[in-house]
From Swiss-Prot:
This is Bifunctional protein FolD. Signal peptide: none annotated. GO terms for cellular component: cytosol. PROSITE patterns: THF_DHG_CYH_2. Its EC number is 1.5.1.5, 3.5.4.9. Homodimer. Keywords: Amino-acid biosynthesis, Histidine biosynthesis, Hydrolase, Methionine biosynthesis, Multifunctional enzyme, NADP, One-carbon metabolism, Oxidoreductase, Purine biosynthesis. The keyword Chloroplast does not apply. Pfam families: THF_DHG_CYH, THF_DHG_CYH_C. It catalyses: (6R)-5,10-methylene-5,6,7,8-tetrahydrofolate + NADP(+) = (6R)-5,10-methenyltetrahydrofolate + NADPH; (6R)-5,10-methenyltetrahydrofolate + H2O = (6R)-10-formyltetrahydrofolate + H(+). Belongs to the tetrahydrofolate dehydrogenase/cyclohydrolase family.
């Protein structure tokens, strides 16, 4: 069993980003990410701060907009429109979840698809499904990078994605499909889940249920990618896989913490650089 070290790979990606940011800056394009936070959700604040810190460390300019929880939908849309029109901004990210009175989908559609570094805009989703180049959601994109770094073969393999969220499950399934895996997507209505997962060469579990994937659901030699981050009552962080028991059967597994998590912000930076490169092309 080999542990997939997301911290090490994310450090490698950040180093690439740092070099690319320096090259772009020399050419007069300073990569810039705008992050919008609505309300005072503690977890969201933590995420936004870590994104800001990562940008700074890699030479990406970051703009942070903190809005009151009672901000109107139209005021948020106005801010997004002004950032869409600002040529110096490469990426726009609205930290989710949003307060109840704001329609999340409507907001995500207002972000210019050329600045949608989270990859949530319908145009980018469509590009991913069609196998065209666009922005891909950061977590699945990071997982694909982990496969690449560890020379994990995807083509021709049976892959099972547990969870069908727009942020992880669906884009993950599309990326695996584009890489020629045979993909099954399972979810809360799936029957006989263990029967399906036992045939899988690759399992990506992303449902937010602690220790959900048990050893008897996994075949020997499988690759398990655990996207879950769950805090137990004793404050311990665990994933969606029962790590202690599942790990013994795997050829590769991501730990929690230190597996998939660090890759998410690294790929957000990578997407911001990609957008800045597109801006440079437009300027030429």
């Amino acid at each position: 069993m080999q542990l997939i070290d997301g911290k090490a790979i994310s450090a490698k990606v950040k180093e690439e980003v740092k070099n690319e940011a320096a090259q772009l800056t020399e050419k007069g394009v300073v990569p810039c990410l705008a992050v919008i936070l609505v309300g005072d959700d503690k977890a969201s604040q933590t995420y936004v701060n870590s994104k800001e810190k990562a940008c700074k460390a890699c030479g990406i300019r970051s703009l942070k907009y903190t809005l009151e929880a009672n901000t109107s939908e139209s005021a948020l849309i106005d801010l997004i429109q002004s950032l869409n029109e600002n040529d110096e901004v490469d990426g726009i990210l609205v930290q989710l979840p949003l307060p109840k009175h704001i329609d999340e989908n409507k907001i995500l559609e207002k972000i210019s698809c050329e600045k949608d570094v989270d990859g949530f805009h319908a145009v980018n989703v469509g590009r991913l499904v069609s196998g065209l180049d666009g922005f891909v959601p950061c977590t699945p994109c990071g997982i694909m990078r982990l496969f690449k770094e560890y020379d994990i073969e995807i083509s021709g393999k049976n892959a099972v994605v547990i969870g069908r969220s727009n942020i992880v499950g669906k884009p993950m399934a599309n990326l695996l499909l584009n890489a020629n895996a045979t993909v099954t997507v399972t979810h809360s209505k799936t029957q006989n889940l263990a029967k399906i997962t036992k045939d899988a060469d690759i399992i990506v579990v992303a449902i937010g249920k602690p220790n959900f994937l048990k050893a008897d659901m996994v075949k020997n030699g499988a690759v398990v990618i655990d996207v879950g981050i769950n805090r137990l009552e004793n404050n311990k962080l665990v994933g969606d896989a029962d790590f202690e028991n599942v790990a013994n059967k795997c050829s590769f597994i991501t730990p929690v913490p230190g597996g998939v998590g660090p890759m998410t912000i690294a790929m957000l930076l990578k997407n911001t650089i990609k957008s800045a490169k597109n801006r440079l092309k437009r300027l030429k």
